[in-house]
Amino acid sequence: MDIQLDPARDDLPLMANTSHILVKHYVLDLDVDFESQVIEGTIVLFLEDGNRFKKQNSSIEEACQSESNKACKFGMPEPCHIPVTNARTFSSEMEYNDFAICSKGEKDTSDKDGNHDNQEHASGISSSKYCCDTGNHGSEDFLLVLDCCDLSVLKVEEVDVAAVPGLEKFTRSPELTVVSEEFRNQIVRELVTLPANRWREQLDYYARCSQAPGCGELLFDTDTWSLQIRKTGAQTATDFPHAIRIWYKTKPEGRSVTWTSDQSGRPCVYTVGSPINNRALFPCQEPPVAMSTWQATVRAAASFVVLMSGENSAKPTQLWEECSSWYYYVTMPMPASTFTIAVGCWTEMKMETWSSNDLATERPFSPSEANFRHVGVCSHMEYPCRFQNASATTQEIIPHRVFAPVCLTGACQETLLRLIPPCLSAAHSVLGAHPFSRLDVLIVPANFPSLGMASPHIMFLSQSILTGGNHLCGTRLCHEIAHAWFGLAIGARDWTEEWLSEGFATHLEDVFWATAQQLAPYEAREQQELRACLRWRRLQDEMQCSPEEMQVLRPSKDKTGHTSDSGASVIKHGLNPEKIFMQVHYLKGYFLLRFLAKRLGDETYFSFLRKFVHTFHGQLILSQDFLQMLLENIPEEKRLELSVENIYQDWLESSGIPKPLQRERRAGAECGLARQVRAEVTKWIGVNRRPRKRKRREKEEVFEKLLPDQLVLLLEHLLEQKTLSPRTLQSLQRTYHLQDQDAEVRHRWCELIVKHKFTKAYKSVERFLQEDQAMGVYLYGELMVSEDARQQQLARRCFERTKEQMDRSSAQVVAEMLF
């Protein structure tokens, strides 16, 4: 795929002025309306000004420089003051059915005059424009900047937390007897800093404060990427109200969620893992440094199930016959991008009861597992942490639930349900305590653009992992489970360092899966070498068809993690639609970690990794945090001239294939499983060369039974053959039952069908493009490149059927291929 780079189109601005003020907690109160495809309600933000949180986090690098005396570089928008008498008065005209909203209020379907929505502008993104200082500029009012896109903001007001009975005890200063801005802000300051053991009380106070009356509307405006709020006369973050309520609604075209139908034809909506994350779902602070907690009440028609990334397993509360309410919360501060919701007619599948406590206490710790029980206080900000809970650290299998559309329950019962316990147990045996207390697994609609996505307490999986046996399902499950540690419990402080999430998950999925299968060491090593062989081939392909600047794992180099004085920044290529299909960060990151593990030895490496997890869970990291600790914790004789600078130069800051990896692949011997595949390839080449009419006595070729990864490698080798006859292709299909294999195998099979114009199997290609949308994008390109009229017609026909439901980025990429 020829990727064209355009900074004005592709760069993603993070606008929030997190150096001046931080959101510590969100309270969402939302209604989901499937008829209008809108989510509407309020969000209350509890804030902490910059001076306070900088003192509390003295170990974190100083993010805010001295404030500039110059005015902010972008023009101050004319603020709008929207009088809304009652944005949610009940409408008797609203009809309720299976798919309708249940709400406390009327839904405003048109933007009111004067309401400044986020409008798309044709002008390009300028990093200087978006990285401006929004702090105090003498006589100007302080501006709270939130990341926001595709939202209709109706009203912003200050919340009178002083009106909540019982909260006056949080005011320590006896001179603050009159209710004032300072009085209210002190209440919030004390509330957000309550100790972790009072988390239930804290959540209760947050909920009560969120329902307190307003005490004055605030001026606000919106542009393409932000919501800007100010209060006349409040010139610093300290003076700005620390509890504000925003009334808003999403737009059907908003890019944070997808409104679609599930595989049973029922409507649903879910966060799709958009490049813009959640800023089209609620106004928030997007930069990872803005770690916050949240609680949410979501109402939907009674036939729907609401799943969220909360730590509690919510049950519905029936409000009236046709409406239910769901309540979720989290107590571990995390970036707003990890907030996840899925509302649909999901069916929960029951499984056999697993007693994780029994599993944890039936046997003593092995010597290697003793490393899990590190002594010492956690290094993160205070929250109720599982790593300090003795029973949690020994819990091999956390409570889990599985949800899917009703038509897929059988497939889930056959594969997914029975794989979750051994995969969770395997992850625990490698890394120790699960960072999160529970797990929901949801099979999402066919338009989901990847095979899986992990969030705190919930995981989305594509339907593509349910076919063709256990292998693809198990490996993907292990990949997403690994993200609980790397990507979620430990996050990247700079989003450009994706390898810190995807590289680790890719490396760990093999280790988890081998452990879950209880493979002997030799078998595990062979399978891992085979997967390394496949990834090596994929990395070579990736290097050939991606721009050099997108092949670098640490593109900002010494400026990694840096922001403007306000905290705003720009993510290079963050909006490039082709980026979600690239695997450079997965593959190069995987090979770097594999290189380090081989250099140190598995025992030393994984012992270190457990120590690293214990040290850095609940925190954001940069590459140097991992590499410096690694090198400090290994003996000199195993370091072998490794240094942070060398690793930067060879692996993280250069494009192309790293030189140490090239040397390793040249010197390494082929594993036994790969050699077996080569022998089978030779047989098939021989079969293909035979004349159509064979002698009767000629011996029929006997083919070996192959593992799924071996089948993938076999088909990739056969793709290198210039011609394969229809007879050979038919024999291939019959020998390996290719139409029934997993999606990875079927993808390569479809490539063979397209390359050799095997018309008898075109139905398999059509099926793949419709049912395996997470993997089908490149197949569209191959159909068009062939310049075969029938194949191009097939591609356009499939796209016409699926484009309305297809993921937006995928549809954009495919449309550019077809037209």
UniProtKB/Swiss-Prot annotation:
Q: Report the co-factor binding details.
A: Binds 1 zinc ion per subunit.
Molecular function (Gene Ontology), one example: metalloaminopeptidase activity
Cofactor requirement: Zn(2+)
Query: What is the protein's species of origin?
Result: Homo sapiens (Human)
Q: Which domain of life is it from?
A: Eukaryota
The UniProt record lists the keyword Zinc: yes
**Which residues carry out catalysis?**
480
A single Gene Ontology biological process assigned to it is: proteolysis
Could you tell me which Pfam families the record lists for this protein? Leuk-A4-hydro_C (PF09127), Peptidase_M1 (PF01433)
Q: What does this protein do?
A: Aminopeptidase which catalyzes the hydrolysis of amino acid residues from the N-terminus of peptide or protein substrates.
Q: What is this protein called?
A: Aminopeptidase O
